Amino acid sequence: MVLDSGTQVYEQAPPRPPAGSPSQHHKLKPSNGNGPPLYPWPESLGMPLALAVPSALQQQTMWQTFSKLHLEQSSHMRRSESTYSVNSTGRRGRGKAPIGRGCDPGGTLRPAASLPHIAKIRKDVGSSSSKSPCMLVALRPTNMDQEREKFFQSHYTYNPQFEYQEPMPMSVLEKYQEASAQFMNQAVGIIEAVLEKFGTYENFEAATGGQLLTKCQIWSTVRKYMQKEGCVGEIVVQLSEDLLSQAVMMVENSRPTLAINLTGARQYWLEGMLRHEIGTHYLRGVNNSRQPWHSTEGRLQYGLQPANPTEEGLASLHSVLFRKQPFLWRAALLYYTIHQAAHMSFRQLFQDLAQYVQDEGVRWEYCVRAKRGQTDTSQPGCFSKDQVYLDGILRILRHRHTIDFQLLTSLGKVSYEDVEQLRPYGVLDNTRVPHFMKDLERYRQQLEHIMTTNRLDEAELGRLLPD
């Protein structure tokens, strides 16, 4: 599901922050320093966006990540990647301070006023035309299906030997090779709270997720949600059975595109996923493109912290918002799985997760996510990026009483810690706030409900995350 904070693909150095007047709009131009030029952006969409790339969706068309991050000179990352490390505590490094499923498979795109287009994802994955591979493509094993079969035929005693299409981006692997234990107590507590109430994960999924939706049901739900956000016709919708995540935003043929995993589109979970991908990532991306810090240079000039963990934390909270039982199960189990993977082989990790998840297919997926980037999974090791979800959730909940959530969204892809310093410089005309955030009293009540349901202790969060 989604997955960068910082910079936009269209880059130009912003003006210096004015002494006492609001920032003005700035035209964006293609960046010449990050791979091939982009397709022209449709004028009807206004400001350009760059969204994320799913691991199974790389095609010969050019993909752009949702606000790129320079891992090396021109590598791409998932939309909400950032230079933030989940192992760090306290303030992060800054730049310089401011100077002053098939109703209509395939076919042509629909006009802006029509229903969202749904197309089956093509599997003819070609080699990337970029100088550097997308992180999710580079870290997705090319022999995953074969290794899965070997693993299950061995009765879970074989450690998969993964192969990858592209050379491993070592800077990424090194960045995410260390797992954090900072919030392990909270992760285990959330998992145990779910199991106490439902007995098993499978019961939890059946009770809170509801039935899997058909393609037409997905289409209808997406259309209704887009109407709520006023973005019908802005986003193409595609369906896939090959995503490691539940959903992902990207750009295909210069159109904002939402790919949805058919195997995870459940009756009561789909709208939460839409709040995550569209209501959070997409709208914050739209708002970010209007700000003077939309580029790498702009973020440095304004001294901004990475947008993560705020970006994914906020989106993850929105995934469970308004549920009767808003358990943070997925974020907690990802956090736990990655911590354990750092000390276990693949088969050991698979057996360890049996205490929480009986379904072997679900366990396999969690283990693959945690072991991404490894070739010999008999060795301990992890890919720790997915710990950002719970990390971001807990940081936002810790400061939920003081965060200006509407301004946080309007300012684009920024950390909650930078909101106050950016308040005088933000371009707030025509920014977009998701429909579920307009009633702030109700929104804050839901955050309290999430705290209570997941048994999160205010004092403990204060100790772990002091001011």
Swiss-Prot record:
Pfam families: MATCAP. It is an enzyme of class 3 (hydrolase). SMART domains: DUF1704. Its main location: cytoplasm. The keyword Protease applies. The active site is at 277 (nucleophile). One of its GO terms (molecular function) is metal ion binding. One of its GO terms (biological process) is proteolysis. Its cofactor is Zn(2+). Disruption phenotype: No visible phenotype: mice are viable and fertile and display no gross alterations. Mice lacking both Matcap1 and Svbp are viable but show a reduction in brain volume: microcephaly is associated with proliferative defects during neurogenesis and abnormal behavior. Cells lacking both Matcap1 and Svbp show abolished tubulin detyrosination. Zn(2+) binds at residues 276, 281, 312. It catalyses: C-terminal L-alpha-aminoacyl-L-glutamyl-L-glutamyl-L-tyrosyl-[tubulin] + H2O = C-terminal L-alpha-aminoacyl-L-glutamyl-L-glutamyl-[tubulin] + L-tyrosine; C-terminal L-alpha-aminoacyl-L-glutamyl-L-glutamyl-L-phenylalanyl-[tubulin] + H2O = C-terminal L-alpha-aminoacyl-L-glutamyl-L-glutamyl-[tubulin] + L-phenylalanine. Binds 1 zinc ion per subunit. GO terms for cellular component: cytoplasm; microtubule. Keywords: Carboxypeptidase, Cytoplasm, Cytoskeleton, Hydrolase, Metal-binding, Metalloprotease, Protease, Zinc. It is found in: Cytoplasm, Cytoskeleton. Residues 1-40, 77-111 are annotated as: Disordered. Tyrosine carboxypeptidase that removes the C-terminal tyrosine residue of alpha-tubulin, thereby regulating microtubule dynamics and function. Also able to remove the C-terminal phenylalanine residue of alpha-tubulin TUBA8. Recognizes adjacent tubulin dimers along the same protofilament. Metalloprotease with an atypical HExxxH zinc-binding motif instead of HExxH, which interrupts the active site-containing helix without affecting the integrity of the catalytic site arrangement. The N-terminal disordered region enhances its anchoring on microtubules, while dampening processivity on the polymerized substrate. This is Microtubule-associated tyrosine carboxypeptidase 1. It comes from Mus musculus. The gene is Matcap1.
